[in-house]
Amino acid sequence: MGRFISVSFGLLVVFLSLSGAGAGFCCPLGWSSYDLYCYKVFKQEMNWTDAEKFCTEQHTGSHLVSFHSSEEADFVVNMTYPILKLDFVWIGLSNVWNQCNSEWSDGTKLNYKDWSGESECIASKTIENQWWSRSCSRTHYVVCKFQA
């Protein structure tokens, strides 16, 4: 009986360690994962304000995409280009010149930059991993992101 309990406990520990939060994560259906975050491309065009609001309605903690490394930006480019071809997607930066904003719309620190001009809101090209200043009232496609 003692051996059975010991083996059962051992199997339980193995099961819990493999299924626990540290063993991996899953994004909801239709979302792609990268570095503990979930991303989704939406083939809907809207202005920056509506795009940010739209993202917050898609999943708890979701915002317009933020980038914290060139590798992450490359992941998003590789994800968006097959769907949108050569176009722009909104990213979670606005009023960066007028208000000296140093945060993404999700509240994370602006610690990676790839500027290409000045304007109120920033969009990323779906092919070149460059950020372009755009009028916030223009419409672009949307990529949302949240931490898994």
Curated annotation (Swiss-Prot):
Q: Keywords on this record?
A: Disulfide bond, Glycoprotein, Hemostasis impairing toxin, Secreted, Signal, Toxin
Q: Name one Pfam family in it.
A: Lectin_C
Q: In which broad location class does this protein mainly occur, judging by the first location in its UniProt entry? A: secreted
Q: Which InterPro entries match?
A: C-type_lectin-like, C-type_lectin-like/link_sf, C-type_lectin/snaclec_domain, C-type_lectin_CS, CTDL_fold
Q: Which SMART domains match?
A: CLECT (SM00034)
Q: In which tissues is it expressed?
A: Expressed by the venom gland.
Give Gene Ontology CC terms.
Answer: extracellular region
Residues in the signal sequence: 1-23
Q: Indicate the segments forming the C-type lectin domain, all copies.
A: 34-145
List the Gene Ontology MF annotations in alphabetical order. Answer: toxin activity
**What disulfide bonds does the UniProt entry report for this chain?**
27-38, 55-144, 121-136
Q: Per its UniProt entry, which superkingdom is the organism in?
A: Eukaryota
- Tell me yes or no: is Phosphoprotein among this UniProt entry's keywords: no
Q: Where in the cell is it found?
A: Secreted
List the carbohydrate attachment sites.
47, 78
Record text on subunit structure and interactions: Heteromultimer; disulfide-linked.
Q: What is this protein's function per UniProt?
A: Interferes with one step of hemostasis (modulation of platelet aggregation, or coagulation cascade, for example).
Family indicated by similarity: Belongs to the snaclec family.
Name the chain's protein: Snaclec stejaggregin-A subunit beta-3
Q: Which species expresses this protein natively?
A: Trimeresurus stejnegeri (Chinese green tree viper)
